Amino acid sequence: NSLAISVMNQWPGVKLRVTEGWDEDGHHFEESLHYEGRAVDITTSDRDKSKYG
């Protein structure tokens, strides 16, 4: 929640989105933590890539 709140405070009206938390399709490298359910891919709701670090 703290990351989502930080996003909303930095950019009012923008929300944090989790796009993938478990990789079933093999899109990540072989040793990725996505295969253990210990990693997530995230974006912002406006999908503005200039906000990504």
Curated annotation (Swiss-Prot):
Lineage: Eukaryota, Metazoa, Chordata, Craniata, Vertebrata
UniProt source species: Carassius auratus (Goldfish)
Protein name in UniProt: Tiggy-winkle hedgehog protein
Family to which the UniProt record says this protein belongs: Belongs to the hedgehog family.
Record-level Gene Ontology MF annotations: calcium ion binding; patched binding; peptidase activity
Binding site for Ca(2+) 1: 19-20
Keywords on record: Autocatalytic cleavage, Calcium, Cell membrane, Developmental protein, Hydrolase, Membrane, Metal-binding, Protease, Secreted, Zinc
Chief subcellular location: membrane
Binding site for Ca(2+) 2: 20, 23, 25
Binding residues annotated for Zn(2+), in chain numbering: 34, 41
GO cellular component: extracellular space; plasma membrane
Localisation per UniProt entry: Cell membrane; Secreted, Extracellular space
Secretion signal, residue range per the UniProt entry: none
SS bonds (residue pairs): none
PTM notes: The C-terminal domain displays an autoproteolysis activity and a cholesterol transferase activity. Both activities result in the cleavage of the full-length protein and covalent attachment of a cholesterol moiety to the C-terminal of the newly generated N-terminal fragment (N-product). This covalent modification appears to play an essential role in restricting the spatial distribution of the protein activity to the cell surface. The N-product is the active species in both local and long-range signaling, whereas the C-product has no signaling activity.
InterPro entries: Hedgehog (IPR001657), Hedgehog_sig/DD-Pept_Zn-bd_sf (IPR009045), Hedgehog_Signaling (IPR050387), Hedgehog_signalling_dom (IPR000320)
Gene giving rise to this polypeptide: twhh
One record GO biological process: central nervous system development
Function as written in the Swiss-Prot or TrEMBL entry: Intercellular signal essential for a variety of patterning events during development. Involved in dorso-ventral patterning of the brain and in early patterning of the developing eyes.
